[in-house]
Design a protein with these regions (language model features):
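Conserved acidic segment of CheY-like receiver
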Residues: 5-16, 21, 25
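The feature encodes the CheY-like receiver
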Residues: 62-63, 90
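Acidic catalytic/metal-coordinating carboxylates
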Residues: 39-42, 65-68
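C-terminal output helix
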Residues: 92, 110-119
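Active-site beta3 strand of CheY-like receiver
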Residues: 50-56
């Protein structure tokens, strides 16, 4: 891990999305991916193990969805920074996640500059 870069946990059941997020994030000067989870149960465990500075969270996943996972992570660490990464048409879920404590939202499909903007805005603090 590079010194001073923010540590990111990427949570998404789609390997392609995790790979894209990892590629984009690791190219930035501000952050790097330290762990990946394919479901919410794994995400909570990895959050406790790695204590990342920020989590990118899919909403619809097997075993445990993003809203429940957001709640569990925030119950462990109320200062956790969680950014929802979700597809068009899931506005109600995104709104619910925001009410539960998610800090920002990135819509799929996303572009590299959108990810970088959120990293600077949320993790760059």
């Amino acid at each position: 891990m590079t010194k001073n870069k923010k540590k990111i946990l990427v949570v998404d059941d789609a390997q392609f999305t995790r790979n894209m997020l990892k590629k984009i994030i690791n190219k930035t000067e501000i952050a790097e991916v330290i762990a990946e989870a394919s479901n919410g149960v794994e995400a909570v465990s990895l959050y406790q193990e790695y204590k990342p500075d920020m989590v990118t969270m899919d909403l619809v996943m097997p075993e445990q969805g993003g809203i429940e996972t957001t709640e569990k992570i925030l119950s462990i660490d109320p200062d956790a920074i969680i950014v929802i990464v979700s597809a068009l048409g899931q506005e109600a879920l995104v709104l619910e996640a925001a009410k539960k404590g998610a800090k920002d939202f990135i819509q799929k499909p996303f572009k590299a500059d959108q990810i970088e903007d959120v990293l600077e805005r949320v993790a760059g603090k």
